[in-house]
């Protein structure tokens, strides 16, 4: 092959690599799971403290957790989702509650 053809092929490779690098990050749902022991007020507190929901939305999500077994608190990139779930789980443990926050890839 000639030098011009190699140069074009090289530019196509770079373009393909750039397109692969420009993919949006994977997103994860942060899910609050129901248990039989954590007080409803504590769940509302968690939703307000870690997810910045107002009292009405936090109460609605708490009821979703209670009646449906779980609720999505938000959708974030992996690092943010992992941090939020870890913060919630540590906070619940600190206060002696078995509340569990998990992640699911979207």
From Swiss-Prot:
Subunit structure: Binds to the N-terminal domain of the chaperone ClpA.
Bias (Basic and acidic residues): 9-20
Family to which the UniProt record says this protein belongs: Belongs to the ClpS family.
Organism: Photorhabdus laumondii subsp. laumondii (strain DSM 15139 / CIP 105565 / TT01)
Function comment: Involved in the modulation of the specificity of the ClpAP-mediated ATP-dependent protein degradation.
Stated name of the protein: ATP-dependent Clp protease adapter protein ClpS
Matches recorded under InterPro entries: ClpS, ClpS_core, Ribosomal_bL12_C/ClpS-like
Pfam families, alphabetized: ClpS
Region ranges (Disordered): 1-22
Superkingdom of this protein's organism: Bacteria
Any GO BP: proteolysis
């Amino acid at each position: 092959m000639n030098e011009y053809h190699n140069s074009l092929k090289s530019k196509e490779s770079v373009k393909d690599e750039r397109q692969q690098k420009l993919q949006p990050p994977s997103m994860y749902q942060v899910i609050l799971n129901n248990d039989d022991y954590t007080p409803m007020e504590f769940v509302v507190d968690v939703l307000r403290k870690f997810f910045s929901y107002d009292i009405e939305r936090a109460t609605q999500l708490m009821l979703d957790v209670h009646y449906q077994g779980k609720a999505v608190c938000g959708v974030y990139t992996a690092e943010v989702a992992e941090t939020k779930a870890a913060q919630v789980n540590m906070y619940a443990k600190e206060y002696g509650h078995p509340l569990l926050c998990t992640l699911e890839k979207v």
